[in-house]
Amino acid sequence: MSNKTELRVEAIKNGTVIDHIPANIGVKVLKLFQMDKTAERVTIGLNLPSSALGSKDLLKIENTFVTPEQASKLALYAPHATVNQIENYEVVKKIPLILPKQITGVFECPNSNCITHGEPVDSSFKVIAKKGNIHLKCKYCEKVYSQEVVTDLH
């Protein structure tokens, strides 16, 4: 008798597959790209078993392709995720995740006294990566926050 477990998630014909997202981050990624408001079919796998991560999240978005700009934003949430572009059921392109040097208008500054609160100014952060840790420095109040603090507010 075999003790194999087989996981199946339906393949998509055209679109994007984002795999190896750390567990409990998949929903944040959906909201970041506003995929929760799309009319396209989205397949979500949460807390799936992963030999590398223990557990992971997975997103499959039909007829939608992640841009390089979106991939750099994704790198803040899941720097080791894989992004595959699918055409006719085949992986035609793997999009590398590269941390942006700067990110503007995506996240709120956690500092309630920052000028970005209450003024018509887009937030702007310098991205600092050191020894595997990601920090964001606000352009206006110059406070430095861990990536988790800033992205949890989004």
Swiss-Prot record:
Keyword Lipid metabolism: no
Residues binding Zn(2+), per UniProt: 109, 114, 138, 141
Record-level GO cellular component terms: aspartate carbamoyltransferase complex
Note accompanying the cofactor annotation: Binds 1 zinc ion per subunit.
UniProt xrefs under Pfam families: PyrI, PyrI_C
GO biological process: 'de novo' pyrimidine nucleobase biosynthetic process; pyrimidine nucleotide biosynthetic process
Keywords, ordered alphabetically: Metal-binding, Pyrimidine biosynthesis, Zinc
Cofactor(s) recorded in Swiss-Prot or TrEMBL: Zn(2+)
Record-linked SUPFAM superfamilies: Aspartate carbamoyltransferase, Regulatory-chain, C-terminal domain, Aspartate carbamoyltransferase, Regulatory-chain, N-terminal domain
Cell inner membrane in keyword set: no
Gene Ontology terms for molecular function: metal ion binding
Disulfide bond residue pairs: none
Family affiliation: Belongs to the PyrI family.
The protein's role, per its UniProt record: Involved in allosteric regulation of aspartate carbamoyltransferase.
Assembly with partners or alone: Contains catalytic and regulatory chains.
Name this protein carries in UniProt: Aspartate carbamoyltransferase regulatory chain
Lineage, opening ranks: Bacteria, Pseudomonadati, Pseudomonadota, Gammaproteobacteria, Vibrionales
